[in-house]
């Protein structure tokens, strides 16, 4: 790039000013002679400190250019993935976008679990402050607090109608709440330690729980009686989740394994052992994900014609793994989180996986290509839980920063 005569003259004067003001007298007088500079005081004032100013502004501009380039690349990616250009995107591909729609405060300790109500525009959060709070996620309003547990509430689960809510706690109990009257209708005792996970079975007749006492138990909703105990994990069972038809249970544990159980017989059908640390969370793949999973893994439909079932697991080893339960094989490992993975789910459309972790982020994975396609800085502290609404374009997250955040998807 060639400078004009005027630009060259200005640059020379700026260099001369720099040399003189920094005490390089010999270099200054040599340079002045060689550049044939006629220096007077009026001009000097104009060029005082000019070289430094130009230098710092160039660095600032470079930084800005790099920021803009990365934003441009992100925008290009969104366009190739069918990003939010106009409103042509299929809702099956909507993903959460920053910033959050609401940041809801009210809990006095870390939030441990967040879930959407299956029918109304409500969500529920559980916390180490021993309370459960109900919020309207569309309006961002606090509705009410459910009190009854005497220690940290670890997990919550709705039945499919949304009329019953189950909760479990470090106080070693499981509670069943009438979500229409917001009253506790039953308390179940039987675990010998912190109850870390609870889920109402799809048929609504039974509740399943997992505990630090290394067992899982099944309870009758009508009576509150424990009807089954599942044993096999060697350490704290972190989470338990039934599959869509309630015939299988998946569990994960501090013993670094994921296990799948047949509900009817209590037998352990699979033990999945590739994680290298505590497995924190699990999630079953919905039917909507089966085509993409088969495409991604090249697993042709088996002789029965029905693929799967498939399961996701997230671990303190910072990875997410996808499993084919029929073979016990790990189909893929998603690497990208910088800390413990605390929550993992399939996008309701089936094409993406969404996760949250102690690296304070929410991540969306294009698992067909095994890559993280979006990272959202979600909270100021560890993100402990997330839920994706099955029908409305919302994601909710909970954190050790004591807030619950609602994210809109588009």
Swiss-Prot record:
Chief location: cytoplasm
Ranges for the WD repeats: 106-147, 148-187, 190-229, 232-271, 274-333, 336-377, 379-410
InterPro entries named among the record's database cross-references: Dynein_regulator_LIS1 (IPR017252), G-protein_beta_WD-40_rep (IPR020472), LIS1_N (IPR037190), LisH (IPR006594), PAC1-like_LisH-like_dom (IPR056795), WD40/YVTN_repeat-like_dom_sf (IPR015943), WD40_repeat_CS (IPR019775), WD40_repeat_dom_sf (IPR036322)
Domain LisH: 7-39
SUPFAM superfamilies in the cross-refs: Lissencephaly-1 protein (Lis-1, PAF-AH alpha) N-terminal domain (SSF109925), WD40 repeat-like (SSF50978)
GO MF entry, a single one: protein heterodimerization activity
GO biological process: apical protein localization; brain morphogenesis; cell division; establishment of mitotic spindle orientation; germ cell development; microtubule organizing center organization; microtubule sliding; nuclear migration
Coiled-coil stretches: 56-82
Keywords linked to the UniProt accession: Cell cycle, Cell division, Coiled coil, Cytoplasm, Cytoskeleton, Developmental protein, Differentiation, Microtubule, Mitosis, Neurogenesis, Repeat, Transport, WD repeat
GO (cellular component) term, any one: kinetochore
A Pfam family this chain is assigned to: LisH_PAC1
Tissue note: Enriched in the photoreceptor cell layer.
SMART domains: LisH, WD40
Subcellular location: Cytoplasm, Cytoskeleton; Cytoplasm, Cytoskeleton, Microtubule organizing center, Centrosome
Domain notes: Dimerization mediated by the LisH domain may be required to activate dynein.
The protein's assembly and partners: Can self-associate. Component of the cytosolic PAF-AH (I) heterotetrameric enzyme, which is composed of PAFAH1B1 (beta), PAFAH1B2 (alpha2) and PAFAH1B3 (alpha1) subunits. The catalytic activity of the enzyme resides in the alpha1 (PAFAH1B3) and alpha2 (PAFAH1B2) subunits, whereas the beta subunit (PAFAH1B1) has regulatory activity. Trimer formation is not essential for the catalytic activity. Interacts with dynein, dynactin, nde1 and ndel1.
Role this protein plays: Regulatory subunit (beta subunit) of the cytosolic type I platelet-activating factor (PAF) acetylhydrolase (PAF-AH (I)), an enzyme that catalyzes the hydrolyze of the acetyl group at the sn-2 position of PAF and its analogs and participates in the PAF inactivation. Regulates the PAF-AH (I) activity in a catalytic dimer composition-dependent manner. Positively regulates the activity of the minus-end directed microtubule motor protein dynein. May enhance dynein-mediated microtubule sliding by targeting dynein to the microtubule plus end.
Similarity comment: family membership: Belongs to the WD repeat LIS1/nudF family.
Name of the protein in question: Lissencephaly-1 homolog B
Organism: Danio rerio (Zebrafish)
